[in-house]
Amino acid sequence: DEGYTIVHVPPILVDERRKNETHPEKSDSLDALGVAKVILQRSDTLLPYTVTPEAVKAKQIKELSMDREYLVDERTRLKNQLHTILHRLWNTEYRVKFKDSFSLKALRYWKARTPKSADDFLIRSMRRKVSRMLDLHNEIQELEKELETLLEESGHTIHTASGCGLTIAATIIGEVGDINRFHSPASLAKYAGCAPRECSSGKTKRWRKSRSGNRRLNCAFHRMALSQISRMGNNKAQTYFKRKVSEGKSKSQALVCLRRQMVNIVWMMLKHKTIYDIHRND
């Protein structure tokens, strides 16, 4: 409100500057000095930070998206633990009793029925884990409903793109924040670590895959690109991928190229709040 420009200073830049000192020291005052020096030297590369309605909504989406990830990770850990317990109780029979051993129907069955000769300790442990699994299922569903509501309120429609479901769309919107921070698809690609970094010397021109950038955003674009070349993906992406392979690139390199194209599409959709149009050529 006072007319000041606020920028986001990644801690890694301050840390790198401190490590380059002859005698690296750390304190709050030195950190503040390091932040000021980074701003003076790299102001043209730092992203602006603005509190807009779009940024606030994106932050809410990010928090819900991360909450969902934590719950899904917990559910995965419980599944692995239950595998061991169910195998000890039913041997290999538990795998053929249900198509999905961890469906709601299966979980309720494991909780209600146990082998007569089973150890009481194992039964109690199994029931605790099954109860938590059922609770997690309900909590994840509630979070997904909230995410759907927030995505609808945001006005963004990137979930209409093939290979971009609810979870990927929520991750992208949450990590990008206000799309107006990024003046071009290239700046978004660099932020996400989807832009190649130059490693040239003399007449030799080389480009390598970037391992920096926002890793959650990078992973979301990677999963989106993988979906594009799956059997259920779209033909244009598959044709582009095959063309890159025919040009001499490895499949992993071709996938990196496709991921960069996904950034272009997502930037355009976020910038103009348009739905995905597979027939567009730009």
Predicted segments, located by residue:
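Short alpha-helix plus adjacent loop in nuclease-associated cores
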Residues: 7-50, 204-212, 229
